[in-house]
């Protein structure tokens, strides 16, 4: 039998209700979905989620066991295989006894091997991928009888039985099995979105009937529904300026940027690649990115997301001018940076804010008046940019600004005639954050990238509108009470 090695469980995640269901001692589960929706990937992920090291029987009617390992490279880290020769039946039977190549098998002989497994091996888990291919050789009466026999033997053996089916309209198994999930793929704003629907999980309470998931890197991963409380900072004892706290609780950075790059094209290219967006080498150097944020998303979520990007540029010794989103004080902003920092904050970070009351971090703040007009704030921005450029020459300059603070409704033209041209000329990478709906179509035509942070089916998504690209799901984990987000491409 195969055995599994240790691996990070965060890479694989199935919905909590389904996880609770598959942990039961015995059950039958039907996984429905059209071709390419992820049935095989989910089945293999369930094996890993249950930490199955032996005593399983995977029947493949579509692919050879060898091809499974080619299509799912991560299996190589879990399943130990020794001296497997595909053309050597004896080796295949001994080394791959857990994976059965049933592409050429007659239904009768295959059905007999399944029942033998149920009778001879105590409490096995059997995955039939797919049941359609086997059942298609049976007439209706024989199929119903065989399905009942499998269920009976499954109960007697205390086994777990998983079927996959590509015919969502076929309901012959529906009343027999204990659980039914269906995988679907839909187009949303030119991007493919995958969902898993929990139709029936006998004995398990279904709190959420559907989840968005991805098959990125051949791994099934679903995403929990949006919960603002996950983005609260609960550990106030961690000091973001403390070298010890930074080294002990540092998490991975979001973008793998080159440490010695002096060309902003490389930075922007890698941002584009991390979001699966096409990057053009013909466009001008300085870039402007507009990120629209759904108003229902809390300031903590926005800050946690932007902190990932800002921290990466800080780690590459770039100059950063950032403006905290409304509702976030400078101290809290620095707290959100904490999971990603690997060294002490230096003079390369400047925060635009209306208050310098926190004396411990006042050195990072450039103050402006609470009653300042957008023109006065723009003037202050130019002063800060000039100061940073004079103090730290030949360094990349990135800015993150709240667009709403510079959008003067009495002088709508200033945004395009003054601010946008200034950023284009003086700032290597400008991120404009809009909490309110963008009022000017002209603005959209003047940016290089348009991203949208919003909720879809109660899941946090980052969409790429300009240029067209894959959507990304946001998930959060915590490092001693501080939230840290990750971005996963939805494919």
Q: Which role fits each region the language model picked out?
A:
Residues 58, 127-129, 156-166, 322-323, ...:
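Structural recognition of the conserved hydrophobic beta-strand(s) that form the central parallel beta-sheet
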Residues 163-217, 429-491:
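Phosphate-binding/switch region of NTP-binding enzymes
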């Amino acid at each position: 039998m195969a055995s599994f090695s240790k691996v990070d469980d965060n890479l694989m995640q199935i919905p909590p209700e389904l996880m609770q269901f598959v942990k039961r001692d015995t059950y039958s589960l039907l996984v429905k979905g059209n071709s390419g929706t992820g049935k095989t990937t989910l089945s293999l992920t369930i094996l890993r989620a249950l930490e199955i090291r032996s005593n399983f029987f995977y029947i493949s009617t579509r692919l050879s066991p060898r091809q499974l390992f080619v299509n799912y490279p991560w299996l190589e880290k879990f399943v130990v295989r020794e001296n497997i020769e595909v053309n050597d039946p004896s080796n295949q039977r001994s080394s791959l006894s857990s994976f059965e190549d049933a592409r050429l098998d007659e239904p009768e002989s295959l059905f007999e091997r399944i029942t033998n497994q149920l009778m001879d091996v105590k409490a096995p888990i059997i995955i039939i991928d797919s049941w359609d291919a086997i059942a298609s050789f049976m007439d209706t009466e024989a199929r119903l009888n065989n399905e009942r026999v499998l269920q009976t033997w499954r109960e007697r053996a205390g086994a777990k039985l998983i079927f996959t089916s590509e015919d969502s309209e076929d309901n012959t198994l529906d009343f027999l099995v204990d659980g039914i999930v269906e995988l679907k793929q839909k187009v949303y704003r030119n991007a493919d979105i995958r969902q898993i629907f929990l139709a029936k999980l006998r004995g398990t309470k279904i709190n959420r009937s559907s989840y968005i998931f991805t098959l990125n890197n051949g791994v099934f991963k679903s995403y929990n529904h949006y919960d603002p409380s996950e983005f609260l900072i609960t550990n106030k004892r961690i000091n973001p300026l403390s070298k010890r706290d930074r080294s002990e609780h540092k998490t991975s950075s979001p973008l793998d940027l080159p440490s010695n790059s002096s060309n902003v094209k490389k930075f922007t290219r890698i941002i584009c690649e991390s979001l699966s967006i096409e990057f053009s080498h013909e466009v001008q150097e300085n870039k402007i990115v507009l990120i629209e944020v759904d108003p229902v998303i809390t300031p903590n979520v926005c800050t946690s997301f932007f902190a990932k990007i800002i921290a990466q540029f800080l780690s590459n010794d770039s100059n950063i001018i950032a403006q905290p989103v409304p509702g976030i004080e400078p101290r809290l902003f620095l707290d959100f940076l904490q999971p990603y920092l690997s060294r002490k904050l230096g003079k390369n970070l400047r925060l635009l804010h209306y208050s310098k009351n926190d004396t411990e971090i006042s050195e990072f703040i450039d103050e402006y008046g609470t009653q300042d007009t957008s023109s006065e704030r723009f003037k202050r921005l130019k002063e800060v940019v000039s100061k940073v450029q004079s103090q730290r020459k030949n360094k990349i300059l990135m800015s993150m600004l709240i667009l709403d603070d510079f959008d003067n409704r009495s002088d709508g033209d200033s945004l395009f005639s003054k601010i946008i041209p200034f950023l284009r000329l003086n700032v290597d990478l400008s991120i404009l954050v809009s909490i309110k709906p963008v009022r000017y179509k002209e603005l959209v035509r003047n940016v290089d990238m348009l991203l949208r942070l919003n909720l879809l089916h109660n899941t946090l998504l980052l969409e790429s509108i300009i240029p067209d690209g894959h959507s990304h799901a946001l998930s959060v984990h915590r490092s001693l009470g501080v939230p840290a987000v990750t971005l996963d491409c939805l494919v």
